[in-house]
A protein has these predicted regions:
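N-terminal alpha-helical targeting/anchoring segments
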Residues: 1-154
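TRNA-recognition modules of translation machinery and tRNA-sensing kinases, especially anticodon-binding
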Residues: 39, 148-446
Length: 446
């Protein structure tokens, strides 16, 4: 959600930043709606004042001079706003009581219209993406993203390596055929040491973030109310991509970002409560998964996958620093696993709907010979906090402010499995277990 007043008061800057995403974006509809709202408010206030003044003229205590003034005000108001129902030009109690009833109906219609326009403004703002920060690079899409840094040496196998899905099926740790029989295309079934590898990554990520990085671990429900999805900007724009449960109007979460952030929905925090750092594991459910060719194979894009999510709530002045901290925590997982990666700063045209600034971590996949996103770390500023009404008091008695929210994957487990299978496979089609996972796995090789 946006600060409507800030946008209208800083229209040039807001438009310039919005156009970082798409040159076709414009705030002209908002300007028109705001103009209509102001007119409705002004007319409604004038109608109420006229109604009150004329009503007082019916009192026995009203002087002739007061009634003359009431007639004058009524005639002027009707001429400006109710030309089809002109006010009597001379005071007659019966005639003015009849005209007052018409004025009440007109005033009520104005109130109704004001509510409609306010709803239209809210609906419009709900569908406008967050404004990119001024430092976000210009660009139209993925090709315009900027590489910030790399870590590790990308592996190049000297043998005919297998892609992760073929290797997983050969080692009997992934079974896509059984998953399809159960749920259809776009699902994965883990077997034996494959299931243990998933569980080991979950435990390693959570242990690292809670023990080393200071996050509070939470385990939230995986089903949430509609207002939670609105709060973290999945709705209304992406409703068709969500799994909805009828007749309760509940949703399977597409990421633990939704449930963790909304722990604080409609809450008033104190400055001493900030920053909040939470991590949590969850399955993630997304209807939009699946595509032709390699993109639709194996674990690349599925309807259900597991992930450990990192969420921060912070004071506005700290969010830029904490964004860098968040990225470093996700990087630490890849470094511990020995997986080469690069950090990409997303351009305006590639930003997610709610992000004001985002860094993607892309892991190297030697068999596919490409970099693949494994974590997105975003700063939302107060965009989500306004939608979810999450505020804090900078000091006792001070005016409340909206917090800033940030989140990132730490990491997506399915894609981490995919990377491990591609990077750590051997010429005899086995998989070396990364050293940090061996105490969880109980084996060195799969």
């Amino acid at each position: 959600m946006h600060d409507r007043r800030w946008i209208l008061d800083n229209l040039d800057e807001a438009t310039r930043r919005l156009k970082k995403r798409d040159q076709s974006h414009s705030f002209e509809p908002l300007v028109a709606l705001d103009k209509e709202l102001k007119a409705a408010i002004s007319t409604s206030e004038a109608a109420s004042a006229t109604l009150n003044f004329v009503s007082q003229s019916f009192q026995p205590s009203a002087t002739p001079e007061y009634r003359v003034e009431a007639v004058s005000r009524a005639v002027q108001f009707a001429a400006s706003f109710m030309p089809a129902a002109p006010a009597p030009t001379a005071f007659d109690k019966g005639a003015y009581q009849a005209w007052n009833r018409t004025l009440k109906e007109f005033s009520g219609a104005l109130v109704d219209r004001r509510k409609v326009v306010e709803q239209e403004i809210e609906s419009y703002l709900m569908r406008i993406p967050n404004l990119p920060q001024a430092s976000v690079p210009d660009g139209e899409g993925e090709a315009d993203n900027i590489e910030v840094r790399r870590w590790g040496t990308p592996v190049e196998h000297a043998f005919a390596a297998l892609e992760h899905d073929a290797l997983g099926e050969k080692r009997n740790i992934l079974d896509f055929e059984a998953a399809a029989r159960l749920s259809g295309h776009g699902f994965a079934l883990y077997r034996g040491l494959g299931a243990r590898l998933e569980r080991a990554l979950q435990a390693f990520f959570l242990d690292s973030h809670s023990d080393k990085h200071g996050y509070e671990e939470v385990l939230t429900p995986f089903i949430v109310r509609r207002e939670c999805m609105v709060g973290t900007n999945q709705l209304p724009k992406f409703e068709e991509d969500a799994y909805r449960i009828l007749p309760d109007d509940l949703f399977l979460i597409p990421t633990a970002e939704v449930s963790i952030t909304n722990i604080f929905r409609e809450q008033m925090l104190e400055a001493s409560d900030l920053p909040k750092k939470l991590c949590g594991f969850s399955p993630c459910f997304r209807r939009e998964a699946g595509s032709a060719g390699r993109e639709g194979r194996g674990l690349t894009r599925v309807h259900q996958f597991q992930k450990v999510e990192l969420v921060h709530l912070t004071a506005p002045e700290d969010s830029a620093r904490i964004h860098d901290e968040l990225v470093s925590h996700a990087e630490a997982m890849l470094q511990a696993l020995g997986l080469a990666y690069r950090v990409m700063e997303l351009c305006g045209g590639d930003l997610g709907f709610g992000a004001s600034k985002c860094y993607d971590l892309e892991v190297w996949l030697p068999v596919q010979k490409r970099w693949r996103e494994i974590s997105s770390c975003s700063n939302f500023l107060d965009f989500q906090a306004r939608r979810a009404d999450i505020r804090y008091r900078p000091e006792p008695g001070a005016k409340p402010r909206f917090v800033h929210t940030l989140n990132g994957s730490g990491l997506a487990i399915g894609r981490t499995v995919m990377a491990i299978l591609e990077v750590y496979q051997t010429a005899d089609e086995r998989i070396v277990v990364p050293e940090v996972l061996r105490r969880y796995m109980g084996v060195d090789v799969i």
